[in-house]
């Protein structure tokens, strides 16, 4: 289950409490179960071939269809990150800085875990660890960052209305959250 840690030391582990805090940012967090047993078995593998990725994506297309109808999403892909990927730290570095996007950042974590950091309207910061079967929508222009946990493993479906709006626009905000340096 998701864990929200605020800069002031407060930690939330209940979805209702987390949702109340995230509502201040218009961030949406949902639980989307993975019911297909074959998909769950594929997700146990550290890496996936392109064919296996497509099998996983197809098995989860019910969620994609919902997003297409409700919000006009047009594309999705599956990103698989693990420690054996060459230059993983270099790849992740561009997301570990505070940035925004012109479009929503929508992720469905299906294996592993990742951490989204946020800057609240009052300037305070928080980090949300999201785990398998959790879906997050970070609204366009929300100041945030992303990093992996110490396991450095995640499989996430990324949803796009267009890929053009997903280019990071870096801000000068200093991340004060201590966990980024600990990873």
From Swiss-Prot:
Catalytic activity, EC: 1.13.11.54, 1.13.11.53
Record-marked site positions (May play a role in transmitting local conformational changes): 104
InterPro entries to which the protein is assigned, alphabetical: ARD, ARD_bac, RmlC-like_jellyroll, RmlC_Cupin_sf
Binding locations of Fe(2+): 99, 101, 105, 144
Keyword Oxidoreductase recorded: yes
Biological pathway: Amino-acid biosynthesis; L-methionine biosynthesis via salvage pathway; L-methionine from S-methyl-5-thio-alpha-D-ribose 1-phosphate: step 5/6
Residues holding Ni(2+): 99, 101, 105, 144
Record-linked CDD domains: cupin_ARD
GO terms of molecular function: acireductone dioxygenase (Ni2+-requiring) activity; acireductone dioxygenase [iron(II)-requiring] activity; iron ion binding; nickel cation binding
Catalyzed reactions: 1,2-dihydroxy-5-(methylsulfanyl)pent-1-en-3-one + O2 = 3-(methylsulfanyl)propanoate + CO + formate + 2 H(+); 1,2-dihydroxy-5-(methylsulfanyl)pent-1-en-3-one + O2 = 4-methylsulfanyl-2-oxobutanoate + formate + 2 H(+)
Enzyme class: oxidoreductase
The record's free-text note on cofactor binding: Binds 1 Fe(2+) cation per monomer.
Residue(s) at site: Important to generate the dianion: 107
Gene Ontology biological-process entries: L-methionine salvage from methylthioadenosine; L-methionine salvage from S-adenosylmethionine
Cofactors demanded by this protein: Fe(2+); Ni(2+)
Keywords noted in UniProt: Amino-acid biosynthesis, Dioxygenase, Iron, Metal-binding, Methionine biosynthesis, Nickel, Oxidoreductase
Functional description taken from the UniProt entry: Catalyzes 2 different reactions between oxygen and the acireductone 1,2-dihydroxy-3-keto-5-methylthiopentene (DHK-MTPene) depending upon the metal bound in the active site. Fe-containing acireductone dioxygenase (Fe-ARD) produces formate and 2-keto-4-methylthiobutyrate (KMTB), the alpha-ketoacid precursor of methionine in the methionine recycle pathway. Ni-containing acireductone dioxygenase (Ni-ARD) produces methylthiopropionate, carbon monoxide and formate, and does not lie on the methionine recycle pathway.
Quaternary state and interactors: Monomer.
Family stated for the protein in its record: Belongs to the acireductone dioxygenase (ARD) family.
Name by which UniProt lists this protein: Acireductone dioxygenase
Organism: Microcystis aeruginosa (strain NIES-843 / IAM M-2473)
Classification lineage: Bacteria, Bacillati, Cyanobacteriota, Cyanophyceae, Oscillatoriophycideae
């Amino acid at each position: 289950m998701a864990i929200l840690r605020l800069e002031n030391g407060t930690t939330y582990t209940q979805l209702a409490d987390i949702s109340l805090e995230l509502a201040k940012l218009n961030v949406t967090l949902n639980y989307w179960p993975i019911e297909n047993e074959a998909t769950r078995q594929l997700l146990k593998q550290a890496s996936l071939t392109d064919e296996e990725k497509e099998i996983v994506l197809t098995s989860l297309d019910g969620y994609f269809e919902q997003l297409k109808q409700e919000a006009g999403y047009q594309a999705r892909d599956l990103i698989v990150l693990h420690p054996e990927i060459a230059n993983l730290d270099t790849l992740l570095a561009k997301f570990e800085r505070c940035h925004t996007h012109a479009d929503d950042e929508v992720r469905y974590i299906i294996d592993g875990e990742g951490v989204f950091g946020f800057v609240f309207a009052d300037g305070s910061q928080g980090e949300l660890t999201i785990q398998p079967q959790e879906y997050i929508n970070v609204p366009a222009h929300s100041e945030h960052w992303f990093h992996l946990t110490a396991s450095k493993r995640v499989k996430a479906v990324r949803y796009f209305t267009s890929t053009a709006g997903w280019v990071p626009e870096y801000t000068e905000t200093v991340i004060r959250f201590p966990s980024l340096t600990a990873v």
